[in-house]
Amino acid sequence: FIISPLGLVGPFERIFNSIQSGVPTHSQAVISDFMDEGYFATHIRRMRSIYAERYHALRDLSERYLPEFLDIQPTQSGLHTVGFLKQDTDEIALSLALDKKGVSALPLSRYCLKKIDNKGFTLGFGAVNPDQIKSSIIIMADTFNELI
């Protein structure tokens, strides 16, 4: 809802109605059948398995290639985890260096309004397969060895 002066209620309603389009009835029916027939639950189970495999690849490869640099945090769900830096170093400089090499590891400070003591990165694993995770971890290890 929106609070507006009485004289603007009409114009706001017209603008809202012109940009607000609901989901077409046909699409709603297809999605309803998809869910009623159990395909949605099957899809969720399949994706959970895929994401768990990718998380474990990230964790295991980090333990193998980055043990002196990152402490990967456990996660039971989601598509990202946190890797805390074990050394006091410039997470932003590391993130920028990784970005130049095609690896996205966003610094935790990006998500904080106040300065925090823990430095590290958010690491996504949902959109990359285990082979891509391995090549990214190797790039991270090489970059960390160069800069730390």
State each model region's role.
Residues 1-49:
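Conserved core segment of the aminotransferase class I/II
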Residues 10, 28-29, 33, 56, ...:
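Feature representing long, continuous alpha-helical segments
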Residues 20, 99-106, 142-148:
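A common structural junction motif
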Residues 42, 62-72, 148:
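Surface-exposed helix-capping loop/turn segments at secondary-structure junctions
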Residues 49-59, 70-84, 94:
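Conserved glycine-rich beta-strand-loop-beta hairpin in the small C-terminal domain of fold type I
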Residues 82-87, 105-143:
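Conserved PLP-binding active-site segment of the aspartate aminotransferase-like
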